Curated annotation (Swiss-Prot):
Assigned protein family: Belongs to the polypeptide deformylase family.
Name of protein: Peptide deformylase
GO BP field: co-translational protein modification; translation
PANTHER family, alphabetized: PEPTIDE DEFORMYLASE, PEPTIDE DEFORMYLASE 2
Disulfide bond annotation, renumbered to this chain: none
InterPro entries the UniProt entry points to: Peptide_deformylase, Peptide_deformylase_sf
CDD domains from the UniProt entry: Pep_deformylase
EC number from the UniProt entry: 3.5.1.88
Cofactor (UniProt): Fe(2+)
Catalytic residues (positions): E155
Source organism of this protein record: Pediococcus pentosaceus (strain ATCC 25745 / CCUG 21536 / LMG 10740 / 183-1w)
List of residues binding Fe cation: C111, H154, H158
Length: 184
């Protein structure tokens, strides 16, 4: 079970490396890692388990965040009324198209690997199309918008060695395009 002590923190060079592409069939150790990453997300979103193990809530976890420089990320995005908007482990994900429309989270973004609040808007594309492989190697394409799109862009950034605060305007953190959508 992944716990907060297992999360790679900002400053560790693995978070700034471009992750290695995976080949199929996946090594069984990577299948286990994928299960553990999704388990962390589920546990972190369960208030009782999160409190018991002192887990910070997360909606996404990329392999570099647990010290592995491989192109794999798990996302578990809750929807309204206890539904799930997106539950998937993305292997070798690539954003193949994106909207011109920019969006940002009204409250800003956070990250399990960044232990401090970093205020500011993180401009993202409101709609994206992502091509990736499943854990079985099947190629899939998904279209995402709003919050799920932001979550996936955040996780895919981890695979490129980019952290969310790299996108924040350094001179004016609350500066964003006039027509940007604030989600929150």
């Amino acid at each position: 079970m992944i716990k907060m002590n297992d999360i790679t923190r900002d400053g560790n060079p693995v978070l700034r490396k471009r992750a290695e592409k995976l080949t199929f069939p996946l090594d069984p150790k990577y299948l286990k890692v994928a299960d553990e990453m999704m388990e962390y997300l589920k546990n972190s979103q369960d208030p009782a388990i999160a409190e018991k193990y002192h887990l910070r809530a997360g909606v996404g976890l990329a392999a570099p965040q647990i010290g592995l420089s491989i192109q794999m990320a798990s996302v578990l995005v809750p929807g309204p009324d206890n539904t799930i908007d997106l539950e998937e482990t993305l292997v070798n994900p690539v954003i193949v198209s994106q909207s011109v429309q920019i969006a940002a989270l009204e409250e800003g973004e956070g990250c399990l690997s960044v232990d401090k609040d970093v205020p500011g808007y993180v401009p993202r594309h409101d709609r994206i199309t992502v091509r990736y492989q499943t854990l079985d190697g099947e190629e899939k394409t998904i279209k995402l918008r709003d919050y799920p799109a932001i979550v996936c862009q955040h996780e895919i950034d981890h695979l490129k060695g980019t952290l969310f605060y790299d996108h924040i305007n350094k001179e004016n953190p609350l500066d964003i395009e006039d027509n940007a959508i604030l989600i929150g």
